[in-house]
Amino acid sequence: MNISNPNGNRKAVVIFSGGQDSTTCLLQAIRDYGPNNVEAVTFQYGQRHAIELQKAQWIAQDLGVKQTLIDTSVIKTITTNAMMSDAQIKQDENGMPNTFVDGRNALFLLYAAIYAKGQGITDIITGVCETDFSGYPDCRNVFIKSMNVTLNLAMDYQFNIRTPLMYLTKAQTWQLADELGALDYVRQYTHTCYLGVEGGCGTCPSCLLREKGLKQYLAQKSAVEKSSVLTAKEA
């Protein structure tokens, strides 16, 4: 991978789960900041499947990135949802998926900010996205912007929360991984499945969105390649 660092000696903390989105963000951060200027924070919040943490640990080690595991499992004692129990995945009467964990991204950003300030780091990167909106209110840009202001005021520190995937579709996120030279890496090593199935169950909302985006991107890529071949033949 060709490493450059347009950010000078600045460093970044990536909120990292081992999934497609956060791994793509981590790879982009390594490119943009340099591998020695990137750290990952991973949260143990009581998620129902250990495979998420295992994947995150393996990827961080493989990429040579320092990873810090933060235990926020206390949240499991004060809220319930399908991400932290064996409940069947469904939506409520308002269309909110029961995979939504109340306060999770707010909590993650708070702890990531506390950690970042302790390391003298201002840039925090998270892979939230509102384009393929899952119904999660804490994935919206308005929330991230407000949280950035709140954290700056709360700690008297100039955090810069970056959301490189905010306005990308899932297909565009796959495209970004490909541009980073890591399409196969993300396909093979990341975990997205809500049911904790190695390689994905293929039926949960997360797997369906991931596969739909991948198929869309590969179809677009194939069309571009065919067009390029035809153009070359005509030249």
From Swiss-Prot:
It catalyses: 7-carboxy-7-deazaguanine + NH4(+) + ATP = 7-cyano-7-deazaguanine + ADP + phosphate + H2O + H(+). Binds 1 zinc ion per subunit. This is 7-cyano-7-deazaguanine synthase. Its EC number is 6.3.4.20. GO terms for molecular function: ATP binding; ligase activity, forming carbon-nitrogen bonds; zinc ion binding. It comes from the Bacteria. Signal peptide: none annotated. HAMAP family: QueC (MF_01633). Keywords: ATP-binding, Ligase, Metal-binding, Nucleotide-binding, Queuosine biosynthesis, Zinc. Its cofactor is Zn(2+). ATP binds at residues 16-26. CDD domains: QueC-like. One of its GO terms (biological process) is queuosine biosynthetic process. Pathway: Purine metabolism; 7-cyano-7-deazaguanine biosynthesis.
